[in-house]
């Protein structure tokens, strides 16, 4: 089994949209977030390994656009998304968001 680096994740309630195309037509809530992925609460169906576009509504009232692939799906609950090839600007925005969350709450090791 591949050894995975442990990441700090934060419990959140961030609005998001997602989908197979960049316009990301489906909506959900991000309930946990780390530098490597998130969990999206939604009733929408996705499949394991499905590539998705994700848009997170940032505190400064703009979208953070990320790409990822579904790790697993819990039918009627939501799915885990692992972030994939994202640009330097998107990674920097995600890091800033995580730092803001770090200041607001206690992190949970995963």
What are these regions (language model features)?
Residues 1, 54-55:
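Short boundary/loop segments of OB/S1/cold-shock single-stranded nucleic-acid-binding domains
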Residues 1-33, 95-110:
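N-terminal helix initiation/capping motif
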Residues 6, 44-48, 81-99:
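Short solvent-exposed strand/turn elements
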Residues 12-53, 78-80:
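Short strand-loop-strand
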Residues 20, 32, 70-72, 85:
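A residue-level detector for short acidic-glycine micro-motifs
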Residues 27-29, 66-71:
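Short beta-strand-centered aromatic/proline hotspots
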Residues 42, 56, 68, 82-85:
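Residue-level recognition of conserved beta-strand positions in structured domain cores
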Residues 57-62:
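Short, charged beta-turn/beta-strand-edge "cap" motif at the junction between a beta-strand
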């Amino acid at each position: 089994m591949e050894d995975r680096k442990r990441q700090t994740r934060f419990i959140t309630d961030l609005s998001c949209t997602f989908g197979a195309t960049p316009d990301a037509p489906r909506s959900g809530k991000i309930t946990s977030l780390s530098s490597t992925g998130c969990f999206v609460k939604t009733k929408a169906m996705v499949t394991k390994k499905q590539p998705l576009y994700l848009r997170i509504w940032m505190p400064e009232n703009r979208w953070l656009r990320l790409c990822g692939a579904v790790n697993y799906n819990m039918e009627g609950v939501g799915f885990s998304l692992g972030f994939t090839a994202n640009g330097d600007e998107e990674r920097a925005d995600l890091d800033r968001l995580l730092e803001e969350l770090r200041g607001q709450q206690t992190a949970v090791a995963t």
